[in-house]
Amino acid sequence: MPIATVIAQAQEYMTDRDLAGWLLYDYRGLNPIFWDTVGPISNVTRPCWLWIPAYGDPQLLVSFVDQNRFAHLGIETTLFVNRKTMTDHLQSILEGQSQIAMEYSPNGELPRVSKIDAGTLELVRSMGVDIVPSADVIQYATQRWNDEQLKSHLFAAEKLSEIVQEAFRHIGDSLASGIKENEVADFINNRFREEGLIVSDGPAVAVNEHASDPHFHPTPENSVTIKPGDWVLIDLWTRLPGENAMYGDITWTAYVGDEVPAKHQEVFDAVIGSRDAALSALETGFREGRVLEGWELDVVARDYIIEAGYGDYFNHRLGHSLGREVHSNAVNLDSWETHDTRQVIPGIAVTLEPGIYIPEFGVRSEIDVFISEDGPQVTTQVQREVVKIRAGG
């Protein structure tokens, strides 16, 4: 996203709140949100600051050594040559300001957007300002998708929905000759390449007890051969190349055989019910004009699974935001690992992916949801029944 757009949207957000500005800081890659905002710049070796006031022009504070690295941004730039001139200039920038936002989360509550070190926090506070978390500014200014970004996600989502079905058919076609988990993962990655999609660190293809590990990664050494009677979980994610392309991320489950065992069906039904309860709560909130916070949706899904008797086996958050990274910087649907009070606002996308992981097998169902101005829009194919894999596809 162009820096001018980020600045304009950040100022739009801050003018409606009691915020004097947003102060971004980085040293040697400590704060990736700084670089998400200004764009990639290589070989910056000294501390750098970006001040975005609620009103007025932004200002960079960078080292004399690094000045040419930032020249293309066209932002007013102040240079420092040593520690004293850096702190003096920073004090001047913050003079008369009251409450400012930084990448800080009280008690580390939201690690995803807690990026400044304690010493820097102390330094800025010593200049007479009150520091509040920038999490909501980040979400509003950097995480809402434009039409091009949504289009890229929809393409990835469509291909993911197609390729996961192809993978299940490929397993069926390969049962007689034998196929391992990692070989199914290779098949999926090859299909990504054929469709012009990027290959990252996945997918997860997990059989039976391997599916009890939410992030199982198949390798030639740990993979098992898939056979009749097995339970198969596939979690796959990808996007188009390019800085403006957004991820899709889905998880499906299948059984190799004609009749799904009762226990597997029971757990599957609990997961599907949990997912649908969270989606229904999101849709209801929108119809009623209530903007939900991330933690609230997690509670809805978790309560459903607790009621089904499997609360002890759902030990991760309900979902995460999507963006240029598969786990992005907008709200997570989480009351478990954190307590995410950010709002689920139009323009962002999230996953709904409850899971139950008992020792013998695990079940997770993951869909993607884009929050449009007209309400939640499910962008991926929705699994309703266990896929049955049969020999010969």
Regions found by a protein language model. Name each.
Residues 1-393:
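Active-site neighborhoods and metal-handling regions in enzymes and metal-associated proteins
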